[in-house]
C-alpha cells in the first residue's frame, strides 16, 4: 500500500495513486488545536499568539475558564480559510464537529453547514447532506474530521499485537503492543472512511472536480508522540489529488501545514493574503523549502516550550524549560499504560534509552 500500515487500502491507496504522496509533510505543532489554528490561517501559531492548546474559549466542557481565555482573538484583518472561501462565493461546511481553534471565533460566520452532532466521521457527507444546500453550480470548500487514533472501540481488532514494531524508547511489554496494534486498527478504519468519502463524491458527480487534501493534524496519541515535536508527533502522511494534479507522484521535499491554506486559495483563484506565511507547494514556480518549523507550548495545564527546525538532512530541537521533566502531569496519567510506565520507572525497570524521556530530568 501507499503507507505500510494500510496494506490492502480502500481509500488511501486511491488518493495516492491518483495524486501526490508527500513523504515529508510536517505539522506546525504536535497537538490538535495549535496545528488546526495554524493551518486554518496559513501562518505559524506562534506568529499570531494562538499557540497555547485550547485557549481562546470562555468555557470548555461546561467549565468556565475565565476571561483570559475568551480574549484571545486573531489580529485585525486576519481571516480564516473558510471565511475567505465563503467571501468568494463558495459553500462551506465542517463535517465532524471539530473547530478546535485557539482564538475566539464564530463557526456560523465560517461555515454554511455544520452537521448535527454525530461525532467524528463522514456520516453527513456520505449522506450527501454537506453540499445539498448549495445553489446550482456553486463550488464548495469543506473540512471533514475523522477520528483517526481516537476511534476507540469503533475500530475493529484486526492487527496482532505480537507482530507490531515497538520503538526502543518504549518498554516492550504487552500493554504497549496492544496500544500500538489498536492505533493501526484505527488507521485501517480511517482508511475505510476515506474510501466512503471518495465514493460519495463520485456518486454525486463531484469527485473529478474536487481537490482533496488528506492529512493528519498530529501523531500517535501515546507518550513522546502527540504534543511533542519529535518525528512521531509532527511528521505526518499527506496526499493531494484532484484537477491539475498528476497521478502517481511521490514527493520527498519538505512541506509544512502552513502551506495548505495558500495552496487551497491559489487553486481556487483567490488572492493569498499577506499574513499567510506558507507557500503554494502545487505551483509550477514553487521553490522547495530549506526547512520547516514546529513548536510545542502549553498543553492543557502542562507548561512547556520546545522548538524544532527540520532541514532535508538534519533536525534541531531546543528545550527552553530544562528544569521541567518531559513527563509532567497530563490527562494521560490515568491510562493503564501510563501507570505501568510510572511503576516501571520507580522500580528501575526502564533502560537508559527509555529514561531519556520518562526520567525525572530532561
Indicate residue ranges for each PLM-predicted region:
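Formylglycine-dependent sulfatase
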Residues: 1-360
Amino acid at each position: 500500500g501507499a503507507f505500510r500500515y494500510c496494506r490492502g487500502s480502500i481509500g488511501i491507496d486511491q488518493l495516492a495513486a491518483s495524486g501526490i504522496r508527500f513523504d515529508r509533510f510536517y505539522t506546525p505543532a504536535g497537538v490538535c488545536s495549535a496545528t488546526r489554528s495554524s493551518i486554518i490561517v496559513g501562518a505559524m501559531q506562534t506568529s499570531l499568539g494562538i499557540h497555547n492548546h485550547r485557549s481562546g474559549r470562555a468555557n470548555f466542557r461546561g467549565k468556565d475558564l475565565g476571561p483570559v481565555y475568551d480574549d484571545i482573538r486573531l489580529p485585525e484583518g486576519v481571516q480564516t480559510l473558510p471565511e475567505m472561501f465563503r467571501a468568494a462565493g463558495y459553500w462551506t461546511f465542517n463535517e465532524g464537529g471539530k473547530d478546535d481553534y485557539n482564538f475566539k471565533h464564530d463557526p456560523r460566520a465560517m461555515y454554511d453547514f455544520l452537521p448535527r452532532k454525530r461525532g467524528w466521521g463522514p456520516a453527513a457527507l456520505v449522506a450527501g447532506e454537506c453540499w445539498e444546500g448549495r445553489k446550482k453550480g456553486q463550488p464548495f470548500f469543506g473540512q471533514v474530521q475523522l477520528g483517526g487514533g481516537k476511534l476507540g472501540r469503533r475500530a475493529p481488532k484486526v492487527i496482532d499485537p505480537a507482530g507490531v514494531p515497538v520503538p526502543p524508547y518504549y518498554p516492550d511489554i504487552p500493554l504497549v503492543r496492544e496500544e500500538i496494534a489498536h492505533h493501526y486498527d484505527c488507521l485501517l478504519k480511517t482508511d475505510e472512511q476515506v474510501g466512503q468519502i471518495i465514493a460519495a463524491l463520485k456518486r454525486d458527480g463531484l469527485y473529478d472536480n474536487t481537490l482533496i487534501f488528506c492529512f493528519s493534524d498530529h501523531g500517535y496519541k501515546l507518550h513522546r508522540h502527540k504534543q511533542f515535536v519529535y518525528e512521531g508527533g509532527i511528521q505526518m502522511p499527506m496526499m493531494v489529488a484532484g484537477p491539475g494534479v498528476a497521478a502517481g507522484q511521490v514527493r520527498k521535499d519538505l512541506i509544512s501545514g502552513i502551506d495548505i491554506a495558500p495552496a487551497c486559495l491559489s487553486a481556487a483563484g483567490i488572492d493569498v493574503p499577506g499574513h499567510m506565511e506558507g507557500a503554494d507547494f502545487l505551483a509550477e514556480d514553487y521553490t522547495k523549502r530549506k526547512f520547516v518549523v514546529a513548536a510545542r507550548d502549553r498543553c492543557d495545564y502542562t507548561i512547556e516550550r520546545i522548538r524544532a527546525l527540520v532541514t532535508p538532512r538534519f533536525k534541531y530541537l531546543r528545550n527552553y524549560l530544562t528544569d521541567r521533566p518531559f513527563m509532567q502531569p497530563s490527562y494521560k496519567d490515568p491510562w493503564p499504560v501510563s501507570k505501568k510506565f510510572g511503576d516501571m520507572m520507580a522500580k528501575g525497570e526502564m533502560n537508559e534509552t527509555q529514561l531519556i524521556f520518562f526520567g525525572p530530568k530532561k
